[in-house]
Amino acid sequence: SGSCSLKTCWLQLADFRKVGNALKEKYDSATAMKLNGRGKLVQVNSRFNTPTTLDLVYVDQSPDYCVRNESTGSLGTQGRLCNKTSEGMDGCALMCCGRGYDQFKTVRTERCHCKF
């Protein structure tokens, strides 16, 4: 009698958060490139390491999303409400792009429909 072993391999996407974090890290460390006289891509700043095939590169600068720009559809961040204590995307430090922000307190009175 003979024995047989069976192996099954498959590809599976990584956790969405991990993929997003990896892409953001690559975006933040992308290398600026330009076309030289021969039409070949070369680094704008040669002090940095040459990008590998796994790195992101770019030719055009990303728009400044802090400033309103109708051609890109960006509404900017001026006048938006931010969360002073948050370190996330809704936090004032990130959303206000270093321009500072106004602070205010609001007192609201609401009926609570409490029963005693």
Swiss-Prot record:
**Classification via Gene3D superfamilies:** 3.30.2460.20
Give me the residues lipidated as O-palmitoleoyl serine: 1
Q: Specify where it is mainly localized.
A: secreted
Q: Which residues are glycosylated?
A: 69, 83
Please list the GO terms describing molecular function. Answer: cytokine activity; frizzled binding
| Alphabetized UniProt keyword annotations | Developmental protein, Disulfide bond, Extracellular matrix, Glycoprotein, Lipoprotein, Secreted, Wnt signaling pathway
- List the disulfide bonds in this chain: 82-97
Q: Where in the cell is it found?
A: Secreted, Extracellular space, Extracellular matrix; Secreted
Post-translational modification here is noted as:
Palmitoleoylation is required for efficient binding to frizzled receptors. Depalmitoleoylation leads to Wnt signaling pathway inhibition.
Presence of the UniProt keyword Secreted in the record: yes
What is the protein's name according to its record? Protein Wnt-5a
In which organism is this protein found? Alopias vulpinus
Report the gene name.
WNT-5A
